[in-house]
Amino acid sequence: MSGPLELPLFPSCYDCLSWSEDGELAIAAGDHVQILTPKNAAERLGHDTSQSPINNWHSVRFRVNVFTNNEWPTIYPQNRDNFSLGAEQSLSNVVALAWSPPGLAKYRRCVLAVLTSNLLLSLYEPVGSQGKWTRVAILNGALKTYFNSIVQEDGMLLRKSNIRAFAWSSPLKLPAERHITPYSVLPAESRWGFHLLSVANDDNDVVVLRIHRPPTGLGAPYEAGVLSVNSFQDTDENYPMLQPSSIFSEILRSKIRILSMSWGPWFHAKESASGFLAVTHGTALKVVHLDVKVLSPPPETGSQPQFQIKAISKDITPKFYEGLGGYHFTGPLAWMNTDDSHTVCLAAGTLAGLILIKASKEPHQGINPSSGQVRLQELLFYESPENDSETEPLRHSEPISAMIVAMDTDSQAPVLYLATAGGFTAAVPFRDGDDEYPIFAVPWKDQLDDVRERYDFDRDLGGLAVARAWGMASCKGMIAAGITVHPGDMIEYRTAAEERLTIIMSTTAGSQSDGLESRSVSDSSPEYLRQQREAALGYILHFEDNNEDRKPLSLSVLYATACCTIIESKNEALLSQAHKVLVRLATITGVDLNDELSKCTASRTTIAPKPAEMLDGPGGQMFERCEICSAGIAWYSTEEAQCATGHIFGMFDAALKALQEDIMLTLLPVIVRCSLTSLAIQDPGSSKVCSSCGKEYLDEDSIEPSESDVSYTCRTLFDAFDTCVYCNGKYRA
């Protein structure tokens, strides 16, 4: 059955939905977070289409309000300005959550950041073979470490380390350089970029952090470094409607906090980049300009990141627009632009409407600094009249509870979607150069009305039911909107058993959907798959030619790659390079490789297993041997492996995985060789698979420490090919 998803929970905050680029939909539900992951086509094959749409999703629910004493130390009473009784005594419910851009977590997935009401910001990701969601970092410690040398008073240090709001920036990617070497791969900083996170603390400091995952598993899973700090202590622009000298105004301004923020686009220069960060400081809107310089350290940096970045930030609100002081900004905030547009638009929620601030890109790109004109448009929320006789349309004054920017699949232009706590929804498309932006209906308006009318009919409310929006999220042309429905003419009594959150799924064009379709290989023809595979083979075979200063790869991986090329490839240049690598291996080890060298020009040949005297002799470590009987392993296929005595590797592993995932096991062919290193996967627990196409790979974390050269080689190769060689899908354990 196609339709909205109904979940037995109630959201604990506005903007309660966040959708990662990997397809995982996170929902803030009090002291829990619920994550919905779409099932792939094979998993949905045996399900009845008449069942509820929720059956098309995997559902995981985990607690986020349980902390150890090391994670959340005991806080003793402080003075009135530093002690937050509500935060310390709260139930630590979720007040905000957001996925990071892809590339930060293990297997280049997304990390989930969760802010709880005790003012702690945590990072979560699935850990272990069972994929249990676990807290892997608390970012308040990075603030405490930074401010510890600056602030001496314990109470002020507590305020500096409490986090009130946060926002992920879009990935800051290094411009891709033109590579002239064959089979080269862009660095991770160009594929995934740097991951920056802005946080606002209890002392109204805006801190920009760089979050990164160390290359090895030693120490903390994630590290956070402070790049810049901006302090907003001036409160004169807040609450302009109040008498500045009144006691009430003074009390209000003493409690001002930064509660929402949003990153704008990056503008790239030759060796630097600049961007904007908009924040709501009380009722005022502030704009921070960030200049980032990328430093390339020498290669002898050990476990440190290959590239370092430094940042300088400053408040440019007066330069950005001088006439913002008369508005009561409440948030949320969002930016709209395209790569080829001449303008950028900042959308900011106000007390009873929306402000659109349109500015030229040219001053920020260094093209024409004198052409920076900023235009302002104020939008008020009016209900569309049902008939021509209505002269006074209903105006909505509720706060904006959800706002996102999604790319329209038809026009390929960004569209701002918003919803209020009173059920008003609107869509504002971005139009480069237009002075006025129109308001349109959202594509899921009919679905929302159907949910509300069904609730109204079931309870005989006479058309007085109201729908409240709690959050919106978008992913790959899909939009999810979370709503609840309530009686509009009475006090509502609701028990925990009656809590319901309805998630409406829609495309940007307005068609109804059950969710994301599973990712598939764009071209599954043998020729396309061979080309994808040859790109990885060529990278390994040309590894030392492209950079002689790098540590060489493992001899066993080089030999396996050369054999795989002989068996599979028809590329003469690649076969010639395999011949060159085999000659180098024979020279280094002194092993007789004439059999392999003679087959570099043959087609669809096999390579016999090595006898025991060669396996035990000099250079024998580069040949594979059976872990059961120590016999040699033949090369007859790039997908299967069998030793001289008949042991076939991977059958138990494939059967176990099929049993765990409740799918039928296909006996032929069985993927038993790593799709990147070409090594035979003999241990059932030493592999990982592509979550899209199912190709099997060796897990670099499962390699024994004694095999240091193989471990280094696998980590080096999987750093370069951190997604599936064939379909660019993400790995999973």
Regions found by a protein language model. Give the residues of each.
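Residue-level signature of beta-propeller blades and closely related beta-rich strand-turn architectures
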Residues: 31, 39, 103, 118, ...
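C-terminal scaffolding/assembly regions of large eukaryotic complex subunits
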Residues: 1-26, 31-45, 52, 79-82, ...
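Structural signature of eukaryotic scaffold interfaces centered on beta-propeller domains
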Residues: 8-20, 86-108, 154-192, 250-272, ...
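Structural core positions within WD40/WD-like beta-propeller blades
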Residues: 25-26, 112-113, 198, 277-278, ...
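Short loop/turn segments that connect beta-strands within the blades of beta-propeller domains
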Residues: 21, 29-31, 108, 115-118, ...
